Amino acid sequence: MSEVFTHINEEGRARMVDVSEKDNTIRQAIASGKISMEKDTLERIKEGTISKGDVLAVAQVGGIMGAKSTSQIIPMCHNILISNCDINFKFDFENSEIEIVAMTKTVGKTGIEMEALTAVSAAALTIYDMCKAIDREMVISDIMLVKKSGGKSGDFERVGL
């Protein structure tokens, strides 16, 4: 791993990295996160009885919109073409939580990790927003990059998950 901060110039000021000379390559990233909640809230999401509607359907759209908006909310992110974004949810009744997994893909000059992380974050925030009227104890946690492939820096896969 490089110890050079690529988003800082010689004067110590923030900058966007110039990727114009880089090759287009297939790049993919997977990120995950969790939102824990009261057991009744989890049951109501699964049963589809939340008054605002189908929580996971809306969260899926929110996650995709988040991925598409990454360059507008993360200052030094490039605006890249996202060729695929898929959001999945896994119910964990034992721990009273939903795991959110986002996969993003592009063919481009820079990575797509931030889009995957933003997709998970936006999906979790959407779940929170749709359920906050009945559960203010929800906690969003463990948002992380799980895997990435493609690009000059090589592949990464988190171990121990």
UniProtKB/Swiss-Prot annotation:
Lyase keyword on record: yes
Enzyme Commission code: 4.6.1.17
Superkingdom per UniProt: Bacteria
Catalytic activity: (8S)-3',8-cyclo-7,8-dihydroguanosine 5'-triphosphate = cyclic pyranopterin phosphate + diphosphate
SUPFAM superfamilies: Molybdenum cofactor biosynthesis protein C, MoaC
Any Gene Ontology biological process: Mo-molybdopterin cofactor biosynthetic process
Name of the protein described by the UniProt record: Cyclic pyranopterin monophosphate synthase
Family of the protein in this entry: Belongs to the MoaC family.
Group of enzyme by EC: lyase
Pathway(s): Cofactor biosynthesis; molybdopterin biosynthesis
InterPro entries: MoaC, MoaC_bact/euk, MoaC_sf, MoCo_biosynth_MoaA/MoaC, Mopterin_CF_biosynth-C_dom
Recorded name of the encoding gene: moaC
